[in-house]
């Protein structure tokens, strides 16, 4: 019947990101292995700076996954800030070119991580502002946090 069709559950799924330490997936038991919606800027910066970012085994590189599956999907262009002696700033509008430069060594993991931190923080800023300015959201957040301890 029509009512049954309206009540069917919907599942929204996405690519499962690797854990930041190189694990096959993020772990709720290790807060350093994932970026959370309520992470502060300094948390994101620390986590990305310490993250696993190998040049070999690109399919095991969580930093590149953030670029491919999140950042480029939202921003369409990733700007990497680099010193002039390292080739200067460069914009990437596709993942393949960024990956090629990363593999060749012309894109250093440190420069990539700084850019990823910047973009993840841009994504999270409206969430942070919402929770900061909304007492009801703060209460709900505290309630959820209570379940994760």
Predicted regions: what they are:
Residues 1-149:
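Conserved nucleotide- and phosphate/pyrophosphate-binding catalytic cores
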């Amino acid at each position: 019947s029509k009512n049954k069709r309206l009540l069917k559950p919907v599942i929204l799924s996405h690519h499962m990101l690797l854990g930041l330490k190189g694990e096959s997936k993020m772990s709720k038991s290790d807060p350093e292995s994932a970026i959370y919606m309520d992470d502060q800027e300094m948390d994101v910066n620390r986590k990305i700076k310490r993250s696993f970012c190998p040049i070999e085994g690109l399919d095991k590189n969580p930093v590149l996954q953030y670029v491919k599956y999140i950042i480029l999907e939202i921003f369409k262009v990733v700007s990497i800030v680099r010193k002039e002696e390292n080739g200067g700033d460069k914009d990437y509008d596709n993942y393949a070119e960024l990956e090629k430069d990363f593999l060749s060594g012309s894109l250093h993991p440190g420069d990539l991580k700084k850019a990823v931190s910047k973009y993840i923080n841009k994504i999270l800023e409206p969430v942070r502002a919402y929770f900061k300015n909304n007492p009801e959201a703060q209460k709900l957040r505290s309630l959820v946090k209570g379940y994760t301890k």
